[in-house]
């Protein structure tokens, strides 16, 4: 039934219209306090984001995190959102306008080791555009089941070279974090922000830990609406959600 309804909406509204409707419904439902059990990290933002915070949302997609970050950091805070996919960026802009989010700057670029043009892809599974799984394509990746597009990539330390404050980074880039974070280290060293990362592979979890630990960062996982300390071994084997890193 769900697939049938989705199919009808896609045919009626088109992909951008469909994403706009779905994201609007999601934001209104979560803003009302529902779905906490399904999305604990999103609701946990209330405990770590303070008024006047400056935040970076890497992999902003259609704005689920940026919307909440914007509301929590307030009029004197700031959110820098990173979303290279034109389709998602368009829906992001719709949501930002609809919810009057005036403290967000959207950069329509990917982040990585070089300033260059890249190819990205979004899986299309059973005719469904899986927008949460968009990623930078490897040279040898089979793209027969992907919707592909060109995007611009920028070096994050250069992009954020002139900011004067940074309190929080959220990153969800489908495995590309190990290519991105080495080129964000100057910014991280300068401000020591709280970092929240979705990391799905064991090697990537280990690599990110080894990158941040020498900077004084400690790793944490979210359990029962609180952060629990993790050892490096815990991090490597962690599969319960996003990882958090912060200095103590």
Language-model features and meaning:
Residues 1-248:
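Phosphate/nucleotide-binding beta-alpha loop and adjacent structural elements of enzyme active sites
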């Amino acid at each position: 039934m769900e697939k049938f309804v989705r199919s009808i909406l896609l045919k009626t509204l088109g992909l951008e219209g469909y994403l706009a409707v779905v994201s609007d419904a999601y934001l209104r439902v979560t803003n009302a306090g529902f779905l906490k059990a399904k999305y604990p990290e999103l609701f946990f933002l209330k405990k770590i984001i303070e008024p006047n915070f400056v935040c970076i949302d890497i992999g902003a997609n259609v704005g689920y995190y940026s919307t909440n970050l914007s509301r929590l950091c307030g009029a004197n805070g700031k959110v820098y959102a990173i979303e290279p996919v034109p389709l998602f960026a368009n829906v992001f802009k719709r949501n930002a306008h609809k919810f009057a989010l005036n403290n967000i700057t959207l950069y329509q670029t990917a982040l990585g080791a070089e300033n260059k043009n890249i190819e990205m892809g979004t899986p299309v599974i059973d005719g469904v555009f899986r927008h949460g799984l968009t990623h930078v394509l490897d040279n040898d990746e089979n793209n027969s089941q992907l919707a592909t597009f060109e995007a611009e990539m920028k070096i994050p330390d250069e992009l954020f070279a002139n900011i004067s404050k940074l309190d929080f980074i959220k990153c969800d880039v489908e495995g590309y974090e190990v290519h991105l974070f080495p080129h964000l280290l100057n910014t991280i060293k300068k401000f020591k922000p709280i970092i929240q990362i979705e990391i799905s592979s064991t090697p990537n979890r280990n690599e990110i830990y080894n990158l941040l630990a020498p900077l004084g960062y400690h790793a944490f996982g979210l359990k029962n609406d609180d952060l629990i300390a993790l050892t490096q071994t815990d991090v490597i084997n962690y599969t319960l959600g996003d990882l958090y890193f912060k200095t103590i």
